[in-house]
């Protein structure tokens, strides 16, 4: 119950001052512990479209970290094929109970533009980005145009 109240309060607070890279922030009607939003990266190759993202807060929040998942496919070395995001800030070993959702979303926005090649979950994409950045960008752009969501105006 404590998690639901805190998450509802943080959702309300974030909704009032939505950063420019986020749109359509909402929670499930039946469950405030599940948030949905549209991420609008500002740099290529991902800046051509938008991506739907889901945050799941555990019942033990804030003592356990939320999970982040792209529900729109994205070609990225730190995002598994099922959409789960590998973000050091929300790993069990790095999580701090005072971390706010807006900090997690800011870290996600940075990660999309600047992949963390120290901790990739898709090694083949990290290798391609390291060895042939132009080919990686071309493939990421094609993937973004194929699967990304139209950006709201």
Curated annotation (Swiss-Prot):
Family the entry assigns: Belongs to the ubiquitin-conjugating enzyme family.
Catalysed reactions, as listed in the record: S-ubiquitinyl-[E1 ubiquitin-activating enzyme]-L-cysteine + [E2 ubiquitin-conjugating enzyme]-L-cysteine = [E1 ubiquitin-activating enzyme]-L-cysteine + S-ubiquitinyl-[E2 ubiquitin-conjugating enzyme]-L-cysteine
Entry function: Catalyzes the covalent attachment of ubiquitin or ISG15 to other proteins. Functions in the E6/E6-AP-induced ubiquitination of p53/TP53. Promotes ubiquitination and subsequent proteasomal degradation of FLT3.
Keywords: ATP-binding, Nucleotide-binding, Transferase, Ubl conjugation, Ubl conjugation pathway
Pfam families: UQ_con
GO molecular function: ATP binding; ISG15 transferase activity; ubiquitin conjugating enzyme activity; ubiquitin-like protein transferase activity
Top-level taxon of the source organism: Eukaryota
Protein name, per record: Ubiquitin/ISG15-conjugating enzyme E2 L6
Single GO BP term: modification-dependent protein catabolic process
Modifications the protein undergoes after translation, according to the UniProt entry: ISGylated.
Subunit structure: Interacts with RNF19A, RNF19B and RNF144B. Interacts with FLT3 (tyrosine phosphorylated).
Domain UBC core per the UniProt entry, residue ranges: 2-149
EC number(s) recorded for this UniProt protein: 2.3.2.23
InterPro entries: Ub_conjugating_enzyme (IPR050113), UBQ-conjugat_E2_core (IPR000608), UBQ-conjugating_AS (IPR023313), UBQ-conjugating_enzyme/RWD (IPR016135)
Gene3D superfamilies assigned to the protein according to its UniProt record, in alphabetical order: Ubiquitin Conjugating Enzyme (3.10.110.10)
Pathway: Protein modification; protein ubiquitination
Active site feature: 86
Name of encoding gene: Ube2l6
UniProt lineage: Eukaryota, Metazoa, Chordata, Craniata, Vertebrata
